[in-house]
A protein has these predicted regions:
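Transmembrane helix interruption/hinge and helix-loop junction motifs
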Residues: 2, 105-112, 279-285, 335-346, ...
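Helix-boundary and N-terminal cytosolic regulatory elements
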Residues: 44-106, 551
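Loop-to-transmembrane boundary segments
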Residues: 70-94, 255, 259, 325-336, ...
Length: 587
């Protein structure tokens, strides 16, 4: 069976599967029925002695590991979690094995069955999850600590110690890893009856995050000696802001390195593609080249996620809708039936998805900027009203009434004002824009703790402004990578056209008079070359989006770069002809 036909069937199957998922999501009765069947089937599988033993053995091994990184997975929760993983991995492995058997039959190659059997290793995912969480925890604490420090600064200004700030964090939704740490410290205080000094020192001795350990040790020492904790917190905020700036500088250096690697790959990849297309094991070489590009893209995505500092937990991402995925698959299917090749339907489908999903993602990123940019001015306006004796509630209402902000910002603040008009005492918001929600969480804490001097509000405004400026600096410094992304498909096409022109000139014998290659050798592999141009363009744009925004949401750029790639591909023959006649002297 031809690989293109097989991929076509795979896409059709995926489309039907997504359609079923959409029906289950929209139809309540169908969803409930499927849920009951799923639970019954799950209980039946996990009730088997073999799977039950796997779950308990893995849980007994992983509980100490999770406790060592202070992750909240108790024995019962961990059993349920591992049971779910074992169940899903079993289903996944069964389907993978069935698919590998079909592929082995279609291609008459039993080696494919081996890959289906390997899919059963997905049952070990809880161990991978532990390793991922272990790295995520340290990064998360670094990202959250400067904001928690200011939360504690607000509490300290009103005469309350760190335990009050920890309680506030637990009752909120803004922090993840600091929230976990807060639960551990408060458990020592309230259940194990330890004093604050011993609780903080013990927690500091059990953490590997250097900045966090120093933060706790310093606070505990000054608390025990009766020093000025407000001054200490002010100093720590400056230290943590400088640490954030340092990590951003490191990230920008890595971003420049990644951009250079992308350009190098763009130049090398056409050579690899054309050489692999004419080797004895062309199919295997092509598969390796394509797989290497996928692995590189995924590896870069993880590397960027690991290196790029976040604002707290980061903003809530816009997820693709099932309808968008189904539409993309339908576009691919229709284009494949009409055009009878693979690269062009994939290009059209990717442009379709990048446009419809990218538009929503672009709108979300624009909304984030519209909510973040007025925050420093807004907080300073509140500080001005506080200086005249107004409460936080009154200052928010007056700022919205008398000051000028953009419409999106005013709309979200109006939600808070409406709550206040109904005698609500909760100022917190849930927009999904982390920095905006954090500012209102601080205002809520100021109101409830009885603090909120003009000075502390000005310091909050300055800190938020510094954070926004650093985020803008990242976007500005990575702008070059965006410009190079537009050039990448042109560069890929130019290198490819140059090689094709040279090889076809040699094939025609114009250089030496000897026919070394058949004339049609390169024409047959054009579809593969075009597919790699599209894949390389998509990879470059995806990586650039992660570098600039820290998010895959800005896929609108992908539709533009893919359109450039498509235009370059359509002009490939003309470019080859021009190079043959002008550079290599062919007639």
């Amino acid at each position: 069976m031809d690989a293109s036909i097989l991929l076509f069937y795979v896409m059709i199957f995926t489309g039907i599967a997504n359609l079923i998922l959409l029906i289950l999501e929209k139809d309540g009765h169908a969803g409930k029925w499927f849920g009951k069947v799923n639970i019954l089937f799950k209980n039946k599988i996990l009730g088997l002695r073999f799977f039950e033993k796997i779950v308990y053995d893995m849980a007994s091994d992983l509980i100490p590991k999770y406790k060592s990184i202070s992750v909240e997975k108790g024995s019962e929760g961990l059993l349920e979690y591992i049971g779910e993983i074992v169940y899903k991995s079993t289903l996944f492995s069964m389907f993978s094995l069935a698919a590998s058997l079909i592929l082995a039959y279609a291609f008459s190659n039993l080696i494919i069955v081996f890959f289906g059997i390997l899919s059963f290793t997905s049952i070990l995912y809880p161990y991978i999850d532990y390793l991922l969480l272990k790295g995520e925890k340290d990064r998360g604490i670094y990202n959250e600590l400067v904001f928690f420090a200011f939360t504690e600064y607000i509490c300290q200004e009103s005469g309350r110690n760190i335990d009050y700030a920890l309680n506030h964090v637990i009752n909120g939704r803004l922090f993840k890893w600091i929230r976990t740490e807060a639960k551990i410290i408060l458990t020592d205080l309230l259940i194990h009856s330890k004093n604050l000094y011993n609780s903080l020192r013990e927690r500091a001795s059990n953490t590997k995050a250097t900045v966090y350990r120093r933060f706790l040790d310093g606070y505990a020492g000054i608390y025990a000696t009766g020093g000025n904790l407000l001054t200490y917190m002010s100093h720590q905020i400056e230290v943590l802001k400088n640490d954030l700036k340092f990590r951003i500088e490191q990230f920008l250096e890595k971003a420049q390195m990644i951009s250079e690697i992308n350009i190098i790959l763009t130049v090398i990849m056409p050579i690899v593609v054309i050489v692999s297309s004419n080797s004895r094991s062309a199919g295997i070489m092509q598969a390796l080249a394509f797989s290497s590009l996928i692995i590189y893209t995924v590896a870069m995505a993880f590397f960027i996620e690991d290196s790029r500092p976040k604002t707290g937990l980061g903003n809530v991402k816009v997820k693709p809708k099932i309808s968008e995925i189904i539409l993309t698959i339908m576009v691919f299917t229709v284009a494949f039936i009409i055009l009878k090749n693979l690269w062009l339907p994939i290009t059209i489908a990717l442009i379709t998805f990048s446009t419809i999903y990218g538009y929503r993602g672009k709108s979300k990123l624009k909304e984030a900027r519209e909510l973040e940019e007025p925050l420093p001015v807004f907080v300073r306006d509140i500080a001005d009203y506080r200086a005249t004796g107004k409460s936080i509630y009154q200052a928010i209402v007056l700022s919205l009434k008398e000051k000028e902000y953009n419409e999106r910002f005013k709309k979200e603040v109006m939600v808070v004002v409406n709550k206040l008009s109904l005698n609500s005492t909760d100022l917190r918001t849930d927009t999904g824009i982390w920095l905006f929600d954090y500012v209102f969480d601080c205002l809520d804490l100021i109101q409830k703790s009885g603090g909120g001097s003009t000075g502390i509000l000005i310091e909050l405004a300055n800190m938020i402004e510094d954070i926004i400026l650093e985020k803008e600096k990242v976007r500005r410094e990575t702008a070059l990578a965006s410009y190079l992304t537009y050039i990448a498909p042109v560069l890929f096409t130019l290198v490819s056209a140059s090689m094709l022109a040279l090889l076809e000139t040699i094939a025609l014998g114009t250089s030496s008079g000897i026919s070394i290659f058949p004339v049609n050798t390169f024409q047959v592999e054009r579809d593969w070359l075009y597919l790699m141009i599209v894949a390389n363009t998509f990879s470059n744009t995806y990586i650039t989006g992660l570098l600039k925004e820290g998010s895959y949401e800005n896929m609108y750029l992908t539709s533009i770069t893919l359109a450039i790639a498509l235009a370059c591909i359509l002009q490939m023959d003309n470019m080859v002809h021009i190079l043959k006649t002008t550079v290599f002297g062919a007639r």
